[in-house]
Design a protein with these regions (language model features):
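Serine-esterase "nucleophile elbow" of acetyl-processing enzymes
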Residues: 1-51, 63-71
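Gly/Ser/Thr-rich helix-start
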Residues: 13, 19, 50-53, 81, ...
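Alpha-helical cap/lid subdomain in secreted, periplasmic
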Residues: 33-41, 57-190
């Protein structure tokens, strides 16, 4: 077996996938490289981001995805923007969120749960701005869930507006900023 220090599964939607990045980059790529370079060890991240998906869709694929990477003891979870955009019931989204977290726990994976920055800035797509109200409710719930389940909360709510390329998706600098936030959470746990 190769000398790999850590493997981290990164699950989410287009924000995890890296949609809109001109070079196909994503926060998971940067996170793996930052961990490897900073600590002089081999870290691997696996990007399971699927554009357009919500918590319920992640639940359908989550268990199988995590089984495909048994060496990934940690999971970066960043989901919920599409739940808010598609105006899904907050209650139902949170049931699906908790079901995903139950799957992670059943497989013995530690979760870093990220909050949602919401929709900001000039040039934002024409999705309803009211989605930010739903995002605020999800973020409040995420904080409570992280506390109750002893997960590591990764707060992305204060993402600088210049890190958005279209009000929702991220610039390359935005992907690096998110990677740095997950990096800090991963290091804080050690």
């Amino acid at each position: 077996k190769s000398n790999v220090y850590g493997v981290i599964a990164c699950q989410g939607d287009s924000l995890t996938f890296g949609s809109r990045d001109p070079d196909g980059m994503s926060y998971p790529i940067y996170l793996g490289r930052m961990l490897s370079q900073k600590h002089g060890q081999t870290w691997a991240t696996v990007n399971f981001g699927v554009p357009g998906e919500c918590w319920a869709e992640l639940w359908r694929r989550n268990y199988h995805e995590l089984l495909s990477v048994p060496e990934a003891g940690e999971v970066c979870l960043w989901m919920g923007t599409n739940d808010a955009w598609k105006d899904r019931s907050i209650e139902q989204s949170l049931i699906a969120c908790e079901a995903v977290l139950d799957q992670c726990r059943a497989l013995g994976r530690f979760v870093y749960l990220a909050t949602l920055p919401g929709k900001r800035g000039f040039g934002a797509p024409r999705e309803p701005w009211k989605m930010n109200e739903a995002i605020e409710k999800l973020n409040v719930a995420y904080k409570k869930i992280a506390e109750e389940r002893r997960l590591q909360l990764v707060d992305l709510t204060d993402m600088p507006v210049e890190h958005f390329c279209d009000g929702i998706h991220l610039t390359q600098a935005g992907n690096k900023w998110v990677a740095e936030k997950f990096l800090a959470a991963i290091e804080a746990r050690r």
